[in-house]
């Protein structure tokens, strides 16, 4: 039978871990990125990289999710920031709502694997597993998930003509 004192002491020891000190700092970094507009700049950079491909805006969303995950470590912060930025822009570009939401939610989910993932840090501390090894184990699957999403978006863009509108074509009509 567990007594309250043992549970409290175990919880206190768990919170004293040096690895857990990273959690609030990554959350704060994600907050600062969202408030300073850095996420929007990351998005514009990703858009410039992949806008020439069919479905480029969806690809830019996934690319931004991966980059933001690699900086903030929080999949929830990635999904919330990207939903504010990407979904309105996807509506302008005639993406179906179900596809926009799916791309943003899936892109945010990639953040669970891309280091420095807060989930991996907490799991490593709780199970006394090497966090460095967990990070190394998460990189390849996270990038493969992003690649799989790229392929799905490109296939969808080849089947739905409205998704194939190029970024440069849209910019020409805005001016």
Which residues does each predicted region cover?
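Juxtamembrane helix-boundary/capping and inter-helix hinge elements in multi-pass membrane proteins
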Residues: 37, 85, 89-98, 126-129
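Juxtamembrane and boundary regions of transmembrane helices in multi-pass small-molecule transporters
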Residues: 123, 133-167
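Membrane-embedded alpha-helical segments of transport systems
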Residues: 68, 103-122, 139-148
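Membrane-embedded alpha-helical segments and adjacent helix-loop junctions characteristic
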Residues: 2-89
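Interfacial loop-to-helix junctions that mark the boundaries of transmembrane helices
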Residues: 10-17, 132-140
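Alpha-helical transmembrane segments and their lipid-water interface positions
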Residues: 20, 26, 73-77, 111, ...
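Alpha-helical transmembrane segments of multi-pass membrane proteins
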Residues: 23, 55-69, 93-110, 134
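Conserved small/polar residues in nucleotide/adenosyl-binding loops
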Residues: 168-175
